[in-house]
Amino acid sequence: MPVPVDDSTAVLEPTEGIERPTKPAVKSRKRFVGSSKAATSRPVVRRVANQVPDDILHDKELNAAIAALPGNYNFEIHKTIYHIRRDNVQSVALQMPEGLMMYGCAIADIIERFTGALPMMLADVTYGACCIDDYTAKEMGAEMIVHYGHSCLIPVSQTTLKTLYVFVEIGIDTPHLSLSVRRNFPSSRSAFQRLILGAGEAAPGGKVPIALESTDESAQATPDLSTNDLPTRLALVSTIQFVAATQALRADLETAMPPLEKGEIEQEEEGMVAKVKRGDIGVWRGKYEVTVPQAKPLSPGEVLGCTAPKLNDVDALIYVGDGRFHLESIMIANPTVPAFRYDPYSKKFTREVYDHTEMRGLRGEAVKAARKNLDDQGSGSWAVLLGTLGRQGSLAVLKSIQNSLPADSLPPLLLLLSELSPAKLALLPNSQISTFIQTSCPRLSIDWGYAFSRPLLSPYEASVAVGRVKGWGGLSLDNGKEGGKLEGEGDYPMDFYADNSLGDWTPRHNPPRPRPARVRPQAQGCAQD
């Protein structure tokens, strides 16, 4: 049995090739000599800005109250209490998605008990950070709003009152996640393409089995690490709750596991048998080439239902999270990249597919119908729907749509709506309105556009309809009075809140500034006599 080593008494051996100095090094002489009035005392420890004081972190009563909340959910109660006390907030609004509303009353009780501030729960539906309702909170008399479950999509410098975003990071079984990836996805690129991508395709919207989940003996055997093949290239994404878990997964996958070590030898009837850990059997032990993509201003690895990064040179993407809404965003933006989903609650891996042909066909028909209605002035005008659910509505996007319409077209009708539904829009007469352009969320048009009796376009699709941009691959539009066809190219973009979006029909479009040309100074010639 190996004897443990006491690090405090370990002796460092001389490093080969490096000679130890035989005498102390001579200190360099000071160029300037002066007197110092500084006292020889311990260095001053400065507290980081917004760091929670110890009296809040170690408050026994507060920690006992926090213990009533799920331990793997980080609601950042200490930080919230600190900000309320520091700014002497008397009333605070709490906003969270429906999945977290069950904890809202407990959080409100804790805030009221330990700060004295009056908590107000905003119970309107909250789909994302774009729904932060600082306007309503301020009108209700709140001095601060705490928004749970989403990232800082709307900067705190733009909100009308003090704003605190709480991501609600959720702790998951990261070792299980890492081993699940290694058990199902070969670290060898050629083996991955043969065993995983060769598993076949499923019906649109369905799932296909992962090859290594079969009962074949070759799939259950310990993978051979003797190959010098290139590593499998994986892209890791998730919602904001699991971004920390994806970063930990990246660190695990980028480091090769050590070779299997034989355990204790036991004597059995058939001979000597070496025991190994059960979890080490059938695990690919090589390292992977991992990418955590970013679509700024989102965090690295974070995806929204409307915003996802483009992927380059990856063999597959792995999404950590429950449901498909956010995953579908990056699948739409990257139709050729195989997608897999790890559900941290059920701890299951599934391969996910998306019917890009059907989606593009439906959206193409809506764009064509809207363009036809625009050319036919007798069919009614376009209506622009400005979303009023939180911060979904963008005046910049509204102005972009209005300016993109042809000068000879009917002026658009402006409508303000918090939530859209086919029944509500059906109340508006067909003779006056032919097409709806909604600015709330592109996924309303992509996922539910077929349910409306008239075209319901996103700002990007409206820009395609008026000819500002070509559109996606497979889309062919009549070029109006100029004749001919406008052929689309590329993929359907999912960049609604990205800084580097395609155009100003998105809220945060920030075109790259042209760099000023550098003028090289002229060489001065020597004067001749």
Swiss-Prot record:
Catalytic activity annotation: L-histidyl-[translation elongation factor 2] + S-adenosyl-L-methionine = 2-[(3S)-amino-3-carboxypropyl]-L-histidyl-[translation elongation factor 2] + S-methyl-5'-thioadenosine + H(+)
Source species, domain of life: Eukaryota
Cofactor binding remark: Binds 1 [4Fe-4S] cluster per subunit. The cluster is coordinated with 3 cysteines and an exchangeable S-adenosyl-L-methionine.
Statement: the UniProt record of this protein carries the keyword Transmembrane helix: no
The protein's Enzyme Commission number: 2.5.1.108
UniProt family annotation: Belongs to the DPH1/DPH2 family. DPH1 subfamily.
Protein's recorded name: 2-(3-amino-3-carboxypropyl)histidine synthase subunit 1
